[in-house]
């Protein structure tokens, strides 16, 4: 019996390993293909995983350098990719910081304070968050068109307006941080109050330091969401130099002009900010994700 169980366990371990490798292959293979396309000559979507004649022409164009062709002609960069990348980092960074600030203070109110209608407001926030932003595109355009007449830096074709529009999607983050706050014992804040701390001091000096993991998670999720967001950004931004990278990359794929190599190089560049932010905050990520869903 022991031998049978040992063989059965061995087969299950092998089956698990095979399934994991298959899953990893499904994730890694598209990434390798994108990298390979960015190093191929010409703008072709098909070809071998390892280019026959690797070329840096697409990367030079993406980084803003002109390329001299074999016939002596010069190809200038078709689009300001680095400007788009900076716009993405700027919008995503500011939006994520503001989302963390608003979500944290709102979650504290829902987790610690008692007021009439608290549960109703929480449920309403979650219900409204379930509707995709695409349903509100017409309303958003009309709203920011009107808002720009009174506050120009929050109107159409402004990064301020785009950031402001993203702040409406904090309901899920409020719920996540609220769940984390509820795992922290109230006695810590009560002890701080006995030592003479005001509610704001207890929140800032006691609760926030203990909440760094979940705040890092919210920042990362917000950053990733904004960097890859297209519908709202493409609606509110009309100037090419104001585009975020996710919106600008669509310029490479017009029906009469599929620049797959340039598109692939820009796609790899778009992953760099997300990767850097993730690496800087990864030590808090696992703990924040697991604790954020626990209610004490």
From Swiss-Prot:
Protein name, UniProt field: Maltose/maltodextrin transport system permease protein MalG
Family to which the UniProt record says this protein belongs: Belongs to the binding-protein-dependent transport system permease family. MalFG subfamily.
Location of this chain's protein in the cell: Cell inner membrane
Protein origin, superkingdom: Bacteria
The organism of origin for this protein: Vibrio vulnificus (strain YJ016)
InterPro entries xrefs: BP-dep_ABC_trans_perm (IPR050901), MetI-like (IPR000515), MetI-like_sf (IPR035906)
Record carries keyword Transmembrane: yes
GO CC terms in record: plasma membrane
Residue stretches making up the ABC transmembrane type-1 domain: 85-281
BP GO annotations: maltodextrin transmembrane transport
Transmembrane region(s): 13-35, 89-111, 124-143, 153-175, 205-227, 258-280
Lineage, highest ranks first: Bacteria, Pseudomonadati, Pseudomonadota, Gammaproteobacteria, Vibrionales
Keywords carried by this UniProt record: Cell inner membrane, Cell membrane, Membrane, Sugar transport, Transmembrane, Transmembrane helix, Transport
Cytoplasmic-facing ranges: 1-12, 112-123, 176-204, 281-296
Periplasmic side: 36-88, 144-152, 228-257
Function of the molecule: Part of the ABC transporter complex MalEFGK involved in maltose/maltodextrin import. Probably responsible for the translocation of the substrate across the membrane.
CDD domains for the chain: TM_PBP2 (cd06261)
Alphabetized PROSITE patterns for the sequence: ABC_TM1
Summary of subunit composition and partner proteins: The complex is composed of two ATP-binding proteins (MalK), two transmembrane proteins (MalG and MalF) and a solute-binding protein (MalE).
Membrane-topology descriptor: Multi-pass membrane protein
GO molecular function ontology, one term from the record: ABC-type maltose transporter activity
